[in-house]
Amino acid sequence: QLIERIGDYYFEQCFRRDIPLAPYTRISFATNGQLWFTEEAQHLIRKYHEFLSVTVSIDGVKELHDAFRVDAEGNGSFDKAYAAFQDGKQKYGWMASKMTFVPESTKYLYPSVKMMVEEGCQHINCNYAYEPYYTVEDAREVYRELVKLSDWLIEAAPDDYVSILHAPVGTGMGCDDRNYCGGTGNMLSFAPDGKAYPCIRYAPISIGEEKASRVCLGSCWDGLYATDEQRKTKEMLDSITRSSQSS
């Protein structure tokens, strides 16, 4: 309902102010698919599907997905997510895929990407989570899985794009040392109460109110970087570079 209200307001203002952006607008978001078939969600999809770009997060094969994505009752969420993916694919041609791996899930990397390619996905974004501690043996296992995946892709789907195999990955860093992620304050995330955070990963929904309060950058009511503490946080974020994150 909130997304619908925001969309309604945006398109109404485009019309009222004679702003020509409406036909070119995309409302892009990812979902875990658990509420996909509720009346509220279906109403939004039917109403705005021509402007929507929706990704259903499926981490891979059922064993992998259910091991790391569970619902409030502790049950695996693959079946609902997969049904949502199939519905979006069949009705609207939405086939984007986003996968996140950790050391414990590396053994599923090849079969998981293979599954989504065979489902028709031609552009798959996948990466490893930043939080876990990685060992040299973890790197060796990732390499072995990527070799298997690459060999299969060359034969079965040579034109498909898998981000973890993107050519520049692993090459030397160029002259531009700017942080490549918007999570240092270049792409703010706003919570429902109007407070601003450097990224959704720093918002209360991700790390809880106590931790999130330490990196709050202001709000839509009081402005950004209005206090000394907020300005110090901005200074810290601005100092983050690609090389500083790798050292």
Question: Which residue ranges define each predicted feature?
Answer:
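Histidine/acidic residue-rich metal-binding segments in metalloenzymes
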Residues: 82, 141, 145
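C-terminal accessory region of radical SAM enzymes
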Residues: 144-172, 202-246
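Short, acidic, Ser/Thr-enriched surface-loop or helix-capping motifs
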Residues: 191
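Radical SAM/AdoMet-radical enzyme domain recognition
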Residues: 2-128
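Short, small/polar residue-rich loop motifs at catalytic or cofactor-binding pockets
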Residues: 181-185
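Flexible glycine/acidic-rich beta-alpha junction loops that bind and position SAM and/or redox cofactors
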Residues: 63-68, 123-142, 162-176, 203-211
